Amino acid sequence: MAYHSAYGVHGSKHRTRAAPDPPPLFDDTSGGYSSQLGGYPAPGADVAFSVNNLLGDPVANMAMAYGTSIASQGKDIVHKELHRFVSVNKLKYFFAVDTAYVAKKLGLLVFPYTHQNWKMQYSHDVPLPPRKDLNAPDLYIPTMAFITYVLLAGMALGIQQRFSPEVLGLCASTALVWVFMEVLALLLGLYLATVRSELSTFHLLAYSGYKYVGMILSVLTGLLFGSDGYYVALAWTSSALMYFIVRSLRTAASGPDSMGGPAPRQRLQLYLTLGAAAFQPLIIYWLTFHLVR
């Protein structure tokens, strides 16, 4: 019994001396972090606080409003300047043509001597479009005639074994430069002569571009009938174009304000019109003589 009791005591003491728990792998520092986090806001709260401050700042709001206003004003200025130099509605007017108008206008350019009324027609102080008024200038015929002239020049150069992209490009650019120079000269002449009329840059560009029709007929006749045919066609188309330019420009430039003007101003208008007409044969010859040999 004693042995058993001693053994029991010894066993109980052995159980009370159990091995201590193993130390943790990481120290528990949650308490320290909790105290530190209490002093700093969360990341999301920082961003929200900055946005709220920006939106609530009157200086920032004023700057944003001013920037928006400046951008809107700049956009309006750009649109205004574009419409000042190139008006889409005005440009559409010069392309408002139909087949009947094109046929009649081409006949008028080739034989204008029997035409009587050269005044442009108006409806409620608005000029009628070209398809309703034969005397109204258009840009469709000059544009198509210029393209046809370039193609015809390429064919003529090819027949003469002188075709190259550089030469064809030089022909096209030279034809455009001459027309623009003529328009600038007319604008300067109208300004110096103090002519008050409804002629715009598009009107002058249309009248100046009608010479391409005579250039096409001259080159085509020269290719078919040689140099003799070329000079006959050149003389005919130049005379017809001169008559057309004199009658058209004189009627368009002589508005109601200029009819009762002084005699020197009327003489300047007449000289300007005659000078523009007399210049047409020289340009036609300069742009076409090298295409016919």
Curated annotation (Swiss-Prot):
Cytoplasmic side stretches: 2-138, 196-203, 250-271
One GO term describing the cellular component: Golgi membrane
InterPro entries hit by this protein: Yif1_fam
Keywords, alphabetical: Acetylation, Endoplasmic reticulum, ER-Golgi transport, Golgi apparatus, Membrane, Phosphoprotein, Protein transport, Transmembrane, Transmembrane helix, Transport
UniProt keyword Hydrolase present: no
Lumenal compartment spans: 160-174, 227-229
Chief subcellular location: endoplasmic reticulum
Subunit structure: Interacts with YIPF5.
UniProt name for this protein: Protein YIF1A
Source organism per UniProt: Mus musculus
